[in-house]
Swiss-Prot record:
GO terms assigned for molecular function: serine-type endopeptidase inhibitor activity
Gene Ontology biological-process annotations: antibacterial humoral response; innate immune response
Source organism: Homo sapiens
Signal peptide: 1-25
Main location per the UniProt record: secreted
Localization, UniProt: Secreted
Keyword annotations: Secreted, Signal
Source taxon at top rank: Eukaryota
Protein name in the entry: Protein WFDC11
Other comments on record: Although this protein was isolated in a region containing several WAP proteins and was defined as a WAP protein, it does not contain a classical WAP domain.
């Protein structure tokens, strides 16, 4: 009987710890509006240096003057510049 209890205690502790960690992790996530997750296309041709300035996973930029948009090099933080029609 005692040996059976020795097996169940670590299993129960592991179960409760994993359940609590998953619940606390879910509470920490911030919910974003659907409009916040929509990306615009970057109008212009970013160079290699600008392609290294990546957005966060929540499509946010560190600098408020920049917006997260998508290009051929991925999602980058960039000041959108309208092109003059040189396609």
């Amino acid at each position: 009987m005692v040996s059976l209890m020795k097996l169940w205690i670590p299993m129960l502790m592991t179960f409760f710890c994993t359940v609590l960690l998953s619940v606390l992790g879910e509470m920490r996530k911030k919910r974003y509006d659907r409009k916040e997750l929509l990306l615009e296309e970057c109008w212009g041709k970013p160079n290699v240096k600008e392609c290294t300035n990546k957005c966060s996973k929540a499509f946010r930029c560190k600098d408020k003057n920049y917006t997260c948009c998508w290009t051929y090099c991925g999602n980058i933080c960039w000041i959108n510049v309208e092109t003059s029609g040189d396609y």
